[in-house]
Swiss-Prot record:
Name of protein: Armadillo repeat-containing X-linked protein 3
Transmembrane regions: 7-29
Residue numbers carrying Phosphoserine: 61, 67, 72, 110
Gene: ARMCX3
Family: Belongs to the eutherian X-chromosome-specific Armcx family.
Organism, scientific name: Pongo abelii (Sumatran orangutan)
Location of this chain's protein in the cell: Mitochondrion outer membrane; Cytoplasm; Nucleus
Length: 379
C-alpha cells in the first residue's frame, strides 16, 4: 500500500512537471512568435488611422524585392521609445525602425513613385495620418514627409489649403519631444510663406512659452527658436515677443554655442526694428552677460552680439528718451550698455584676447556708444 502510494505521488509529480514544462514552452514560444511578428511587420492590432480613407496601418507595405528591411511598417515595442537625457531613443534599432516607418508612409502616400515630392492627393493622405494617428512613430514619419514637402514653395500653399496648419499645430500639445520637434520643423518650413505666417501667428505665444520652458539646448528648443526667427523676419509680429525678450537673453547666457547663435538670430531681427528698441533696452539681462567678452568665447557669437548692440544704438534717440530713462530698471540692457566700458576695457586691454577684428569692432562700438547713446555732456 505504501509502495503504491509512493508510485502515485511520483506519477503525479511527473504529470505536474510535464504540465509546467508545457506551459513554459507555450509561453516562451508565444513570446517568440510575437517578436517575430513585430520584426516582420505582422498584421497585429495596429490599425490606428481611424476611418481615414486608405490610411490603414496594417495595409502599409513595401513590395520592393531589392530590400528585405522594407517589408512593412514595424510596430515599436513599448521599450523602444525610452529616451535618454538628450531626448533621443535609447535603442539604436529604433532609429532603423523609424526609417522603415518613414519609407512606408512615403510608399503608402505615393505607391507608384519613388519621388519625395507628393501630389495634393498624397499630401492629403499624410495629413490624414497626422490628424488621426496617436502612435508616435507614425506621427514622426508622417511629419518628416510633410516637412520635406513643405520645403518647396508650391507645396506650402497646398498644405495650407488642405487645412494642414491647424492639424500640425495641434501636435505641439504632445509630450513626446521627438514628435514635437518634427511638428516645429514642419511649421518652420511653412512659415516662409507670408499667408502662412498670418495664420500661424495665433500659435506664436504657445511656441514661445514651449521654447523657453523646454530643456536647455534640446532639439525642441532649437526648433522653436528657428520657427520664432522665421516669424520675426518682418516687423509685423515682433511685438508678440516683447514680454519674452528677457527670457531670450537668459537662454543666450546659459545655452551652448548652437543655442547662443540661434537666439542671436532672433534678437537681431528684433534689433533691426526701431519700434522694438525700447522693449530691448527694457529687458532684464543676466549679470553673466558681460563675461561673454572673454578670450574663450566664440568670435562669431561676440561679433553678432556687437551687431545687435550697434543696431540698438543706431535706433536709440537720446533726445526723445532722456526724460524716460527712469523707465529702464536696474539690471536692464540699458544699464548694461551704459556700463559696457568695463567689458570693452577687458577686450581692448588684453593683447592675447581674440583677434584683431574683435578689438576693432569693440573699439568702434564704444566710440559710437559714447557719441550717440550716452554722450558725456548728458551724463
Amino acid at each position: 500500500m505504501g509502495y503504491a502510494r509512493k508510485v502515485g505521488w511520483v506519477t503525479a509529480g511527473l504529470v505536474i512537471g510535464a504540465g509546467a514544462c508545457y506551459c513554459i514552452y507555450r509561453l516562451t514560444r508565444g513570446r517568440k512568435q510575437n517578436k517575430e511578428k513585430m520584426a516582420e511587420g505582422g498584421s497585429g492590432d495596429v490599425d490606428d488611422a481611424g476611418d481615414c480613407s486608405g490610411a490603414r496601418y496594417n495595409d502599409w507595405s513595401d513590395d520592393d524585392d531589392d530590400s528585405n528591411e522594407s517589408k512593412s511598417i514595424v510596430w515599436y515595442p513599448p521599450w523602444a521609445r525610452i529616451g535618454t537625457e538628450a531626448g533621443t531613443r535609447a535603442r539604436a534599432r529604433a532609429r532603423a525602425r523609424a526609417t522603415r516607418a518613414r519609407r512606408a508612409v512615403q510608399k503608402r502616400a505615393s505607391p507608384n513613385s519613388d519621388d519625395t515630392i507628393l501630389s495634393p492627393q498624397e499630401l492629403q493622405k499624410v495629413l490624414c495620418l497626422v490628424e488621426m494617428s496617436e502612435k508616435p512613430y507614425i506621427l514622426e514619419a508622417a511629419l518628416i514627409a510633410l516637412g520635406n514637402n513643405a520645403a518647396y514653395a508650391f507645396n506650402r500653399d497646398i498644405i495650407r489649403d488642405l487645412g494642414g496648419l491647424p492639424i500640425v499645430a495641434k501636435i505641439l500639445n504632445t509630450r513626446d519631444p521627438i514628435v514635437k520637434e518634427k511638428a516645429l520643423i514642419v511649421l518652420n518650413n511653412l512659415s516662409v510663406n507670408a499667408e502662412n505666417q498670418r495664420r500661424l501667428k495665433v500659435y506664436m505665444n504657445q511656441v514661445c512659452d514651449d521654447t523657453i520652458t523646454s530643456r536647455l539646448n534640446s532639439s525642441v528648443q532649437l526648433a522653436g527658436l528657428r520657427l520664432l526667427t522665421n516669424m520675426t523676419v518682418t516687423n509685423e509680429y515682433q511685438h508678440m515677443l516683447a514680454n519674452s525678450i528677457s527670457d531670450f537673453f537668459r537662454l543666450f547666457s546659459a545655452g551652448n554655442e548652437e543655442t547662443k547663435l540661434q537666439v542671436l538670430k532672433l534678437l537681431l531681427n528684433l534689433a533691426e526694428n526701431p519700434a522694438m528698441t525700447r522693449e530691448l533696452l527694457r529687458a532684464q539681462v543676466p549679470s553673466s552677460l558681460g563675461s561673454l567678452f572673454n578670450k574663450k568665447e566664440n568670435k562669431e557669437v561676440i561679433l553678432k552680439l556687437l551687431v545687435i548692440f550697434e543696431n540698438i544704438n543706431d535706433n536709440f534717440k537720446w533726445e526723445e528718451n532722456e526724460p524716460t530713462q527712469n523707465q529702464f530698471g536696474e539690471g536692464s540692457l540699458f544699464f548694461f550698455l551704459k556700463e559696457f566700458q568695463v567689458c570693452a576695457d577687458k577686450v581692448l586691454g588684453i593683447e592675447s584676447h581674440h583677434d584683431f577684428l574683435v578689438k576693432v569692432k569693440v573699439g568702434k562700438f564704444m566710440a559710437k556708444l559714447a557719441e550717440h547713446m550716452f554722450p558725456k555732456s548728458q551724463e
